[in-house]
């Protein structure tokens, strides 16, 4: 069986850092935009991947797993309207200081405001759903790679630091591009 991973360097950095932080549990609600991230995690034996097509249920599952294990739990879906279903559980995680890490896959931010489907403004989030929110852009330069590493670390650290809590990582994805594992 051939194994394929995303060529999105920002996603590969995030996956690598998740491993370095010992984050294993991922609840995936795959959609068009986050498929490269989800597929890469599914093909990596390190991760425990749970599938949940309903984003609201996925977020509450993450709260339950984080409560039971005391470990950070990743939830992932597309970053447009689907991610809005995370709000009730993320609010709960915020007030209970649960280490839930929402990774939302987003298409190019330039599409916002041009009547493109599933292209909504994601630059602002509600105050009480995450203690930290970062945007991991596509990487084209060494400086962007450094910024991605810093921001991803910031989010992952904050999920457990000072009592912890939910964090949001918006991952810009260039869809449809995979490469074979060597």
Where are these regions (language model features)?
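N-terminal alpha/beta PP-like core and its mobile active-site loop of ThDP/TPP-dependent enzymes
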Residues: 1-182
């Amino acid at each position: 069986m051939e194994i394929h991973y995303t060529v999105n360097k920002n996603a590969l950095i995030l996956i690598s850092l998740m491993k370095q932080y010992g984050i294993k549990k991922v609840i995936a609600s795959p959609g068009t935009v986050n498929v490269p991230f989800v597929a890469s995690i599914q093909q990596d034996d390190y991760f425990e991947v749970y599938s949940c097509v309903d984003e609201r249920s996925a977020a509450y599952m993450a709260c339950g797993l984080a409560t039971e294990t005391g470990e950070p739990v990743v939830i992932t879906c597309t970053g447009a309207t689907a991610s809005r279903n995370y709000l009730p559980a993320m609010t709960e995680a915020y007030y209970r200081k649960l280490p839930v890490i929402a990774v939302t896959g987003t298409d190019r931010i330039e599409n916002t405001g041009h009547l493109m489907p599933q292209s909504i403004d994601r630059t602002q989030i509600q105050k009480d759903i995450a203690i930290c929110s970062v945007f991991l852009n596509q990487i084209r330069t060494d400086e962007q790679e450094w910024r991605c590493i810093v921001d991803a670390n910031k989010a992952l650290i904050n999920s457990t630091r000072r009592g912890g809590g939910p964090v949001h990582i918006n991952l810009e994805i260039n869809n449809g591009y995979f490469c074979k594992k060597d």
